A protein has these predicted regions:
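Short gly/ser-rich loop at a beta-strand->alpha-helix junction or flexible surface loop bordering the NTP-binding
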Residues: 1-155, 273-295
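Surface segments flanking catalytic/ligand-binding clefts of nucleic-acid enzymes
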Residues: 135-295
Length: 295
C-alpha cells in the first residue's frame, strides 16, 4: 500500500500545481484513503461516481466554497464535499493535508454498506499500516466528538458508524479475513480470536488468522501464492496440526455464495461441538444490522 500512497501523493501534487483555488487543499474520501495507504472499500460507483479513485476529492468546511472550487474544474475530475462537523487531519510530507483515516471513515459511512464500513474500519486498524497506528478507542473518541457539538445535528451516517464499531477488530491482515469473521458470527458462532499466537510442537511461533483457543481450532484464509509460499504454508499447517489443532482452510470459493458459506460454518460448528460439546444452529444467517443491535 505504500506504493499506492506515494502514487496518490504525486497525483495530488500535480493536481495542486495545475489548479489554484486560493484556499488550503484538504483531500478527502477515497483520495484520502489512498494517501494514507488504506485499502479502498467496495463502493457502488454507479450510485456514487464522484467517489471513483480516478476523481480528485476535496473537502471544505463551508458550503459557500463549493461552487467557487467547482467553477475551476474544467475537466470534471474534481469532487467537492462539505463537512462542517469536527474534522481530523493527517499530513504527508510537509505539504499534503488530508482527512485522517478515522475522519474519512466517518465521512464515507453514508455511502457504504454496514459490512463495507466494518471492513474499512478493520483496514484502518490493521497491524502493518502506512499511516500511524489507531485503536478502537480512537474511533470511539472521534464519534463522541461528533456527537458533542452543541446546536448542530450529528452528521449523516453516525449511527451506522457506532454500530460498525461494535464489530470492528484490530490486528487483521486483509478484507477477506474480516468478511470471513463476519460470516462466522452472522451464522451464530462465537467471535473467534484474531491473530492468536501459538508455539507449535516444532518450537516455531505462529499467528493464526482466526482461532478458538480453548477448542484448539485454527481458521486460516488461504490466498493465491506461488509454489514457494505454498510449501511454506504446508509445513506451517503440518506443524499446527501436529500440535493438536484442527486446521480449517478457507479460500475465496468458501465465501463465494450462500451454499459455500453454509458448508464452511457447518464444518466449524461441527468441530466446535466435537471439542466443546456445545451445539450451534448455523443454518440461519442474521443480517449485520440486526446483529449489531444485539451487542
Amino acid at each position: 500500500m505504500r506504493e499506492a500512497s506515494e502514487e496518490a501523493a504525486r497525483e495530488c501534487r500535480r493536481f495542486r500545481a495545475e489548479h489554484r483555488f486560493g484556499l488550503v487543499y484538504v483531500f478527502g474520501m477515497t483520495r484520502a484513503l489512498r494517501l494514507a495507504g488504506v485499502e479502498i472499500p467496495r463502493i457502488d460507483l454507479s450510485a456514487h461516481p464522484r467517489l471513483s479513485e480516478q476523481r480528485m476529492q476535496l473537502v471544505v468546511r463551508n458550503k459557500n466554497l463549493e461552487p467557487r472550487v467547482r467553477a475551476q474544474d474544467a475537466n470534471h475530475m474534481l469532487a467537492v464535499y462539505v463537512w462542517d462537523a469536527p474534522m481530523d487531519f493527517a499530513c504527508l510530507g510537509d505539504d499534503l493535508i488530508f482527512t485522517s483515516p478515522i475522519c474519512t471513515w466517518a465521512m464515507l459511512a453514508r455511502f457504504l454498506s454496514l459490512e463495507e464500513l466494518i471492513v474499512l474500519g478493520d483496514s484502518i486498524l490493521r497491524r502493518n499500516t502506512v499511516h500511524r497506528q489507531y485503536s478502537q478507542a480512537d474511533f470511539k473518541n472521534y464519534l463522541i466528538a461528533l456527537r458533542a457539538v452543541k446546536g448542530r445535528r450529528a452528521p449523516r451516517g453516525i449511527v451506522k458508524c457506532e454500530r460498525a464499531l461494535t464489530l470492528m477488530r484490530p490486528g487483521t491482515d486483509s478484507s477477506r479475513e474480516t468478511k470471513l469473521r463476519l460470516c462466522i458470527v452472522q451464522h451464530g458462532l462465537p467471535m473467534p480470536m484474531i491473530n492468536h499466537r501459538i508455539r507449535a510442537i516444532n518450537g516455531n511461533v505462529y499467528y493464526l488468522d482466526l482461532a478458538y483457543p480453548d477448542a484448539k481450532i485454527a481458521i486460516e484464509y488461504d490466498g493465491m501464492f506461488h509454489s514457494g509460499q505454498w510449501l511454506h504454508d504446508s509445513d506451517r499447517r503440518n506443524a499446527i496440526e501436529a500440535s493438536g489443532w484442527v486446521f480449517i482452510q478457507v479460500t475465496k470459493t468458501s465465501l463465494s455464495d450462500h451454499s459455500h458459506r453454509l458448508m464452511l460454518v457447518r464444518r466449524i460448528a461441527h468441530e466446535l461441538e466435537m471439542r466443546t460439546g456445545i451445539h450451534y444452529f448455523v443454518d440461519a444467517q442474521t443480517p449485520l444490522a440486526e446483529l449489531v443491535k444485539r451487542r
